[in-house]
């Protein structure tokens, strides 16, 4: 019996030591690891690892908070929190660093969706195009906020001194920083950094693609129309036009009313030229050749075919020339007649300065060429009137 009691003493001592270690925060497995090695550094590492663990409920709360702050994908949010030992501020910085890498990987993907945004004052209007990959992201409030902010930034830029000034991403990137004030996107930063951060949030390729600024004279107005608007100042299609009155006393509110209606007309009808005089000779001759070939198949006389060609050519002008187009609001008249009626109403001759139509995802060069054609020959058109 004495032998049996003495044999129990080492076991009792061992259990007592285990209880002591358990009280210090070790699990049983950690205690075994401690007993199996005399290495002090190893036990210290285990202690740090176990003391830094965050309860599951707190982990979910941190993931939720960081997700609300950044809108980043949940898997990226969790990865940053884990790598930063569940420090939410450090994880937020880590997410921004990851965003640069992710945005670079996505930059080659096609971004043909998105929104146009417009900012406007009495004499100038700025339109920008911000692209993404899906219309789902285009409905995101952060995406819409950044698009509007870029339009306001373009409008606040130094007056380029041109009535129509098309620009690419470098114009805003080189000249100005954007000051953002959104819960998920804030602070003063470059345009490229803001776009990159947004791309990381939404998980898509996001690009600021292009824009233009349109101005008018002292006796004119800039009128605009946005189609399919998720909110004011945003849309997928934009029409702009400047109307100018010869008399400085002409009421500009009447010009605004009619101008907005014509801007809507421009979105609907897609005019390519301002007047017949501005249609290039090569374009007219090319269309005439096509119509003549079509007429020859009719088997009619030469005189009849010429009349047919001229009639169809007038129809062509009605399709592509703004002043000759049937007014979408009232197809019994055309835009030229609408402007004549407006001139009588305000007691002063009213003319079109410039116009533009822009659509999300369309070719940049086509828009720029259209605007430059109208602008470059504006004086010639006025003289021909």
Swiss-Prot record:
Q: What's a single GO MF annotation on this record? A: translation elongation factor activity
In terms of superkingdom, the source organism counts as Eukaryota
Function comment: Associates with the EF-Tu.GDP complex and induces the exchange of GDP to GTP. It remains bound to the aminoacyl-tRNA.EF-Tu.GTP complex up to the GTP hydrolysis stage on the ribosome.
Question: What species is this protein from?
Answer: Oryza sativa subsp. indica
**Protein name per its UniProtKB record:** Elongation factor Ts, mitochondrial
Q: Transit peptide residues?
A: 1-50
- Belongs to which family? Belongs to the EF-Ts family.
Localization recorded for this chain is: Mitochondrion
């Amino acid at each position: 019996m004495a032998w049996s009691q003495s044999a129990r003493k080492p076991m009792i001592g061992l259990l007592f030591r285990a209880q002591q270690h358990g009280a210090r925060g070790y699990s049983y497995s950690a205690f075994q690891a401690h007993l199996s090695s005399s290495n002090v550094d190893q036990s210290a590492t285990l202690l740090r690892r176990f003391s830094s663990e965050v309860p599951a409920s707190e982990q979910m709360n941190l993931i939720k908070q960081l997700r609300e702050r950044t809108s980043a994908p949940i898997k990226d949010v969790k990865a940053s929190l884990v790598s930063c030992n569940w420090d939410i501020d450090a994880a937020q910085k880590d997410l921004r660093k990851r965003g640069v890498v992710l945005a670079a990987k996505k930059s080659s993907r096609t971004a043909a969706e998105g929104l146009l945004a417009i900012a406007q004052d009495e004499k100038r209007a700025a339109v920008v195009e911000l692209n993404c990959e899906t219309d789902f992201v285009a409905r995101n409030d952060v995406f819409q906020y950044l698009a509007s902010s870029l339009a306001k930034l373009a409008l606040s830029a130094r007056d380029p001194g041109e009535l129509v000034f098309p620009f690419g991403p470098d114009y805003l990137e080189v000249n100005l920083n954007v000051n953002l004030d959104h819960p998920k996107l804030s602070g003063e930063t470059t345009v490229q950094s803001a776009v990159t951060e947004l791309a990381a949030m939404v998980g898509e390729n996001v690009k600021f693609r292009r824009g233009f600024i349109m101005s008018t004279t002292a006796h004119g107005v800039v009128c605009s129309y946005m189609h399919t608007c998720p909110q004011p100042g945003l849309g997928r299609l934009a029409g702009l036009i400047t109307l100018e009155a010869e008399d400085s006393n002409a009421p500009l509110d009447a010009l605004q009313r009619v101008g907005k209606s014509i801007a809507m007309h421009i979105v609907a009808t897609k005019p390519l030229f301002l007047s017949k005089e501005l249609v290039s000779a090569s374009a007219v001759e090319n269309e005439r050749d096509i119509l003549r070939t079509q007429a020859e198949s009719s088997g009619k006389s030469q005189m009849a075919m010429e009349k047919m060609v001229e009639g169809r050519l007038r129809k062509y002008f009605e399709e592509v020339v703004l002043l000759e187009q049937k007014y979408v609001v009232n197809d019994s008249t055309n835009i030229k007649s609408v402007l004549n009626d407006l001139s009588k109403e305000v007691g002063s001759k009213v003319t079109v300065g410039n116009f533009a139509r822009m659509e999300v995802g369309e070719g940049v060069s086509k828009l720029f060429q259209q605007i430059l054609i109208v602008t470059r020959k504006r004086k010639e058109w006025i003289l021909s009137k």
